[in-house]
């Protein structure tokens, strides 16, 4: 069973987005696959797993949230890490992504992940294809 959704939360108000997420979780099963194409990743970041990031016809990343958080660290802080693959200025500091060499736990930020992948295409592909 496959369900393909293109920008499913586009134009929805906040209560409708919440209802959509609940429906996706309710009707997801082991024998079904839901493919969601979206630019509104914050609307769906708690229901997406695995994450596949494409660049035209090239798969840059195809990994579970567990694998991503094992290999990459997502940090919110006031100082930039020297091995940062991606960083973005936020009010009060930075969000940054760097290799998780200390095996620390962090919550995957899908927007930062997307930007880190596109900024470091070959490096990220290498990190995740050499499992």
Where are these regions (language model features)?
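ABC transporter nucleotide-binding domain
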Residues: 19-35, 39-96
């Amino acid at each position: 069973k496959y369900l393909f959704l293109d920008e499913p939360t586009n134009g929805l108000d906040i209560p409708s987005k919440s209802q959509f997420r609940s429906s996706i979780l309710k009707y997801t099963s082991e024998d079904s696959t839901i493919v969601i194409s979206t630019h509104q990743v914050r609307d769906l970041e708690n229901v997406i797993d695995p994450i596949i990031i494409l660049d035209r016809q090239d798969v840059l990343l195809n990994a579970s949230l567990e694998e991503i958080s094992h290999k990459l660290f997502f940090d919110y802080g006031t100082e930039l890490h020297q091995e940062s693959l991606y960083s973005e200025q936020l009010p009060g500091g930075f969000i940054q992504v760097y290799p998780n060499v200390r095996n620390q736990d962090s919550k995957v930020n899908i927007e930062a992940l997307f930007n880190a992948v596109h900024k470091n295409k070959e490096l990220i592909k290498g990190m995740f294809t050499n499992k």
